[in-house]
Regions:
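Active-site SXXK
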Residues: 172, 189-215, 235, 291-295, ...
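Conserved catalytic neighborhood of penicillin-recognizing serine enzymes
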Residues: 223-252, 257-279, 286-289, 341-344
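Active-site-proximal alpha-helical segments within enzyme catalytic domains
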Residues: 200, 287-296, 335-359, 416-432
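Beta-lactamase-like hydrolase cores
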Residues: 130-171
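Active-site helix/loop module of the DD-peptidase/beta-lactamase fold
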Residues: 208-242, 270-273, 300-337, 341
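Short, charged, amphipathic alpha-helices and their helix-cap/turn boundaries
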Residues: 144, 149-155, 173-178, 251-277, ...
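Structured C-terminal helix/loop/strand segments within mature extracytoplasmic catalytic/sensor domains
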Residues: 29-42, 55, 63, 410-452
Length: 452
């Protein structure tokens, strides 16, 4: 009888399951992909929708359009917005995830038993009434440059680039800014990986304060093997050699870190080595997550104190008055991806770099740090990445061939840019939601030509 039941199980359940799995495999989907797909899709959907609605203040229709551009698969999910609780539920075939908003620190996925975010507080200071960059006032607009920039933004969007903000700073003053309909100088824009460049600066501030050295190794007690030889500088250069891939297919390390684990740092600390540290560059949001973990550990005794300290002693002197820096469920500031700010505030990051680490009368990092941050890394495969900043010419193939060799930038998904041209005392900010590659070299070369 038991043997017959086993045969029936095989015939009616196992065999069809194997056939379905084989059919998906023919289409290129592995069992690991299929197993993780519902969790990853609903996690991404809930997180994006929550932040779009309650951080960026988009309506449901705009959020739905942006989510579809990010991935058409996410448009297949069902979304429920609870405006009273500021929570979003995303569901797919019976599988659902929720993300919740919290005052001052935005949205993140909910995980049972993880309440660390509820202990965090981002101190809200009274806005400084002063001219940019100390405050928010702009009275230095050049009418000619303003018209040129507005024309460029309109042309971008005629071409389908979905540019939402362009801003130009020349010699320390905002001389032009243009916004797409529905966006203003007070709109918050997600910088995606531009947050990585800010993480690099936070490490620099800790070095200036004597709280770390970039040559340090033995960084975390969980690393009692070959990983103990990884240095802070290798994390900054993304040459740490950890077995992490910036691939967002379900089952890969990137979505697992961001959308399937409550503590991004704990997940990264569990990964083994793949390469010898310092030898090979591999783009890694995980490296930046570990840097943020280190920042909070070296800043204060707990996450709540660290977040308040960074708000008071890093972002406030920088002059970033309208921003949201999201954390994961374990209370870690997600410096790999999730910092929202106005175009004027993003420009302050570029101006800080242009000023050699000083802004608004306060030194944030040393001038030596800025110089080292903009040096090519020593990897054997890709050297145009400094301390979380992209460099124009570290190889024979410039990133922006029409611009000087010493140009550098913060870059983010959907073609976000804060680009600095030191030779012309220029900072250029581009923010949007591009579905494909943006014409940044063409536009930035044109903008630079206006100031020659």
């Amino acid at each position: 009888m038991k043997r017959m039941l086993r045969w029936l199980l095989a015939i009616f359940i196992v065999v069809p399951l194997l056939l379905v799995t084989a059919a998906w495999a023919v289409l290129g989907y592995s069992p690991v992909y299929l197993y993780n797909a519902p969790s990853v899709a609903t996690g991404i959907g809930a997180k994006l929708a929550c932040s779009m609605r309650y951080v960026m203040a988009q309506n449901e229709q705009q959020a739905a359009a942006d989510i579809k551009i990010y991935s058409p698969i996410l448009a297949l999910l069902d979304y429920h917005y609870d405006d009273e609780q500021r929570r979003v539920r995303a569901s797919l075939a019976g599988y659902e995830r929720t993300a919740s908003w919290q005052e001052g620190i935005g949205c993140y996925l909910d995980y049972a038993g993880f309440t660390e975010r509820q202990r965090l507080h981002w101190p809200q200071a009274e806005a400084v009434v002063a001219d940019w960059p100390q405050g928010y006032n702009v009275s230095s607009i050049d009418p000619v440059k303003q018209q040129q920039l507005a024309t460029m933004l309109a042309e971008d969007n005629t071409l389908g680039h979905d540019t939402r903000a362009l801003l130009v700073v020349h010699k320390g003053q905002v001389v032009a800014e243009a916004y797409a309909p529905g966006y203003t100088e007070r709109s918050l824009f997600l910088g995606w990986s531009m947050a990585k460049s800010i993480t690099g600066l936070m490490i620099g501030q800790l070095e200036m304060q004597g709280k770390l050295e970039v040559t340090e190794t033995g960084l975390f007690p969980q690393w009692q093997d070959g990983r103990s030889s990884i240095s802070i500088e290798q994390l900054l250069h993304m040459t740490d050699g950890l077995a992490y891939d910036e691939i967002y297919d379900p089952g890969a390390t990137a979505p697992a870190m961001l959308f399937q684990h409550p503590s991004a740092a704990a997940y990264m600390l569990s990964l083994p080595l793949r390469d010898e540290p310092g030898r090979h560059y591999r783009y890694s949001s995980g490296s930046t997550v570990l840097l943020n973990h280190l920042v909070q550990q070296r800043t204060a005794a707990n996450n709540a104190a660290a977040v308040e300290h960074l708000a008071e002693h890093f972002f406030r002197p920088l002059g970033m008055q309208r921003m949201v820096y999201e954390t994961d469920a374990a209370g870690l500031l997600m410096g790999s991806s999730y910092l929202y700010a106005t175009a004027r505030d993003w420009a302050k990051v570029g101006q800080l770099m242009l000023n050699g680490g000083e802004i608004n009368g306060t030194r944030i990092v040393t001038e030596d740090w800025i110089q080292r941050a903009l040096q090519p890394n020593g990897s054997d495969n890709k050297r145009d990445f400094g301390y979380q900043w992209w460099l124009n010419k570290a190889t024979d193939k410039p990133r922006w061939p029409g611009l000087p060799d010493n140009v550098f930038a913060a870059q983010g998904n959907r073609e976000q840019r804060v680009l600095v041209i030191p030779d012309q005392d220029l900072v250029i900010v581009r923010l949007g939601w591009s579905p494909g590659k943006y014409r940044d070299n063409e536009n930035f070369v044109e903008i630079a030509s206006w100031f020659r």
